[in-house]
Structure formats: C-alpha cells, structure tokens
C-alpha cells in the first residue's frame, strides 16, 4: 500500500515537472518573438499605440534584415532558420519584380563588409546608414499621414520607370520620399542657380570649340536648368498639397530631360557641392534611387 502511494506521489511529481517544463518552454518562445517595439523596422514609432502594420513595413523589415547572423541575434536557432527561409523567399520574389532594388541592397551589404576594423570608417558608415533610415522613416510616416492615395503616388512616380505591381506599389511612398529629398530646393537650387547664371558666358566663349551637336545639347540643358530654377523660385510656404504635387511631377519631368541631355561642362559641374557633383546617373531617375551607387543619398 505504501509502495502504491509512493508510486502515485512520484507520478504527480513527474506531471508537475513536465508542466513546469512546458510552461518554461512557452515563456522562452514568447520571449524569442520580437515585440513591435524591438522588431527590426525602419518605421517611426507611433506614440498612440500598436497599429496594424502596412505591407510596405513588412517588406522593409525583410529587406534590411539581410544576414542570417542578424536573425540569430534576435531569435533562437529554430526561429532564426524560419526567419532566414522567409527572407530568402521574399528576396527571390523581389528579385523577379525589382532586380535593381535587390542589387542596391547587395551593394549596401558589400559596402558594410568593406568597412573593416577602422573605428572612424565604421562610425562614418553607421552614421550614414542611421541617418538614411531615419530620414526614410520620417518621410514615409509623413506621406502616409498626408492621405495621398497609391494612385496619386503612381502618377507622381510614373516617370521613374516603375510599372504598377503589388510588390512595387508598396514601396512607392519610400521611393517618393527619397526623390523629394533629392529634388528639394535646399539641395539643388543654390548650385543650379549658380550654374545657370554662368552658363550663357560659357556658351559664348566655347561655341567655336564645341561640336555643333554637343553645343546644342548644352543650350537645351541651360534652358531646362532655367525652368528648374523657376519651379524652385515659385515655391511658397502657403502652397497647397495639390500645388506641391504638381510641382514635384514637373520637377521629375525636367530632371529626366536634364538627364537625357547628359552632363554639363566640367568647368560648370565643378561648382556643384561635394557629394552631389551633379551626377545625374547616380540619381538613377529611371529606376530605384541608389541602384547605380553605394553613396548615402539622404544626409
């Protein structure tokens, strides 16, 4: 009888230990799952509380979590494998829809790998990346709160060579925020205005030494630059959203015209500020910004 009671006690103790083990495993699983506050995202935090994540946010999370080591730091081994598989799947789908965008992130990864152990270079790369992501998050949030529809964004971005598609439409707000930063008055106007003022004298002094076809392109280029400056000069703090959108579309069109005409004369392009150098190819207006370079575009 005593043996039976002892066996029963052992069984109860085993059940209790099993229950505690299961509860511990569940607790560990819950701890392994990233909360919205710690999830790898470039979206700006919302003080009003957790909200449903947009498809674009999920895509951004997957794109920037580009190494398995990153997943290992956030999850246990099993969840890391699952996250890695999901990332690879997302990248394969993206590669079919936006090969240039995939190339951009591959170059970013390669650039990070070349930083090395030098403290100053690491700090510079980290600072550039942090400021870029912060700028994207801020502008993406502002665009989402502005009430602009995806149809309006598509119209504004159709000059970038981005055809409508499920995967591409979700990143349009980010792409537009990048272009708005690049085409802002603070970035372009001072140098463009200076070049525009010096262009007539350069054209006059180089007409005989410049091939006629190239000289005509320079004349057209000067004309387009004048129009761009006029667009900037027409800006006012009281412009409506409709006016701002119309001006942005006009600026995209003018910048594409400028890109088609090639680079300005080196003597004039040298007036551009360091880091910009009027490299229109680096802006890559016919595709996702940054696809042709590793430069930090938003500072």
UniProtKB/Swiss-Prot annotation:
Membrane association type: Lipid-anchor
Modification Phosphothreonine, positions: 236
One BP term from GO: peroxisome fission
Propeptide: 297-299
Gene it is expressed from: Pex19
Name of the featured protein: Peroxisomal biogenesis factor 19
Region (Docking to the peroxisome membrane and binding to PEX3): 2-56
Functional description taken from the UniProt entry: Necessary for early peroxisomal biogenesis. Acts both as a cytosolic chaperone and as an import receptor for peroxisomal membrane proteins (PMPs). Binds and stabilizes newly synthesized PMPs in the cytoplasm by interacting with their hydrophobic membrane-spanning domains, and targets them to the peroxisome membrane by binding to the integral membrane protein PEX3. Excludes CDKN2A from the nucleus and prevents its interaction with MDM2, which results in active degradation of TP53.
Family recorded in the similarity comment: Belongs to the peroxin-19 family.
Region (Disordered): 1-61
One Gene Ontology cellular component: peroxisomal membrane
Residue list for modification Cysteine methyl ester: 296
Quaternary data: Interacts with a broad range of peroxisomal membrane proteins, including PEX3, PEX10, PEX11A, PEX11B, PEX12, PEX13, PEX14 and PEX16, PXMP2/PMP22, PXMP4/PMP24, SLC25A17/PMP34, ABCD1/ALDP, ABCD2/ALDRP, and ABCD3/PMP70. Also interacts with the tumor suppressor CDKN2A/p19ARF.
Keyword terms: Acetylation, Cytoplasm, Lipoprotein, Membrane, Methylation, Peroxisome, Peroxisome biogenesis, Phosphoprotein, Prenylation
Compartment list: Cytoplasm; Peroxisome membrane
Modified residues (N-acetylalanine): 2
Region (Necessary for PEX19 function on peroxisome biogenesis): 2-91
Lipid addition sites, S-farnesyl cysteine: 296
Extent of Acidic residues compositional bias: 12-27
Phosphoserine sites (modified residues): 35, 66
GO MF annotation terms: ATPase binding; peroxisome membrane class-1 targeting sequence binding; protein carrier chaperone
Organism: Mus musculus
N-terminal signal peptide: none
């Amino acid at each position: 009888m005593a043996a039976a009671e002892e066996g029963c006690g052992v069984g109860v103790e085993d059940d209790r230990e099993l229950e505690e083990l299961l509860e511990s495993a569940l607790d560990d699983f819950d701890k392994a799952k990233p909360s919205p506050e710690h999830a790898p995202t470039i979206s700006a935090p919302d003080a009003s509380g957790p909200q449903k994540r947009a498809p674009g946010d999920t895509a951004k999370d997957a794109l920037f979590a580009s190494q398995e080591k990153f997943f290992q730091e956030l999850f246990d081994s099993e969840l890391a494998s699952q996250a890695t598989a999901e990332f690879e799947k997302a990248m394969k789908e993206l590669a079919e829809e936006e090969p240039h965008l995939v190339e951009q992130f591959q170059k970013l990864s390669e650039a990070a790998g070349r930083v090395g152990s030098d403290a100053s270079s690491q700090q510079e790369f980290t600072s550039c990346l942090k400021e870029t992501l912060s700028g994207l998050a801020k502008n993406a949030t502002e665009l989402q709160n502005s009430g602009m529809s995806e149809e309006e964004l598509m119209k504004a971005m159709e000059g970038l060579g981005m055809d409508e598609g499920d995967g591409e439409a979700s990143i349009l707000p980010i792409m537009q925020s990048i272009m708005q930063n690049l085409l802002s008055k603070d970035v372009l106007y001072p140098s463009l205005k200076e070049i525009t003022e010096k262009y007539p004298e350069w054209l006059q002094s180089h007409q005989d030494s410049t091939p006629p076809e190239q000289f005509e392109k320079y004349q057209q280029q000067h004309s387009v630059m004048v129009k761009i400056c006029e667009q900037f000069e027409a800006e006012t703090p009281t412009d409506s959203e409709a006016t701002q959108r119309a001006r942005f579309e006009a600026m995209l069109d003018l910048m594409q015209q400028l890109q088609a005409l090639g680079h300005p004369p080196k003597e004039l392009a040298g007036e551009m500020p360091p880091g910009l150098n009027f490299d229109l190819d680096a802006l890559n207006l016919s595709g996702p910004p940054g696809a042709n370079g590793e430069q930090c575009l938003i500072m």
